[in-house]
């Protein structure tokens, strides 16, 4: 009795592994878009508010205070991580495009993509988590250490910072997806 499914073509050679570089290129394009948008939103997060003081009458009743992303090391770390991710995604998009246009890609390039994507995923996840925790402290405060919430005063600033942290988390998920995709592609080529 003969089987109706064929694993090998008539010539006897194995079926070539699927070329997933089109998907890889698309994910890297999404990574660039998410990193650039998070970067722009973070850089534009500045707000100035007049805050009342409890000083005696000869002193001003209100003080003008700025909220900027530069005031927090966590947000500076997020800025650097997003900048590096933008640069990295451009470089790897070029490499992915070169892999699409070449007839066969080397397992060595796939291995380097897996390693570098994993490192970048770790950097982006840590930066997004750090910025998210500081944004949460700004939103809710911490009564145990007398840190007051500031998002009731600096609402626009908090929206920008929170949105940037959320989109950065999307960039980390895209990087993890790229690690999985490159690992699968490498596995299929080396089998």
Swiss-Prot record:
Keywords: Cell membrane, Membrane, Transmembrane, Transmembrane helix. Coiled coil: none annotated. Its main location: membrane. Residues 1-22, 95-118, 182-191 are cytoplasmic. It is found in: Cell membrane. The keyword Ribosomal protein does not apply. It comes from Musa acuminata (Banana). The chain crosses the membrane at residues 23-43, 74-94, 119-139, 161-181. It is a multi-pass membrane protein. One of its GO terms (cellular component) is plasma membrane. This is CASP-like protein 1D1. The keyword Plastid does not apply. Residues 44-73, 140-160 are extracellular. Homodimer and heterodimers. Belongs to the Casparian strip membrane proteins (CASP) family. Pfam families: CASP_dom.
């Amino acid at each position: 009795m003969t089987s109706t499914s064929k694993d090998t073509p008539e010539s006897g050679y194995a079926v070539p592994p699927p070329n997933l570089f089109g998907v890889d290129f698309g994910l890297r394009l999404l990574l660039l878009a998410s990193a650039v948008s998070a970067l722009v939103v973070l850089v534009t997060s500045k707000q100035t508010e007049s805050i009342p003081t409890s000083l005696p009458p000869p002193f001003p009743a209100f003080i003008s205070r700025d909220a900027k992303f530069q005031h927090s090391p966590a947000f500076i770390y997020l800025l650097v991580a997003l900048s590096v991710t933008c640069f990295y995604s451009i470089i790897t998009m070029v490499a992915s495009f070169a892999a699409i246009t070449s007839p066969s890609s080397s397992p060595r390039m796939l291995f380097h993509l897996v390693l570098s994507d994993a490192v970048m995923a770790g950097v982006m996840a840590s930066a997004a988590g750090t910025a998210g925790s500081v944004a949460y402290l700004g939103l809710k405060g911490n009564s145990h250490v007398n840190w007051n919430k500031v998002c009731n005063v600096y609402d626009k600033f908090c929206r920008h910072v929170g949105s940037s942290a959320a989109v950065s988390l999307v960039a980390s998920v895209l990087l993890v997806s790229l690690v999985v995709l490159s690992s699968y592609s490498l596995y299929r080529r080396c089998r």
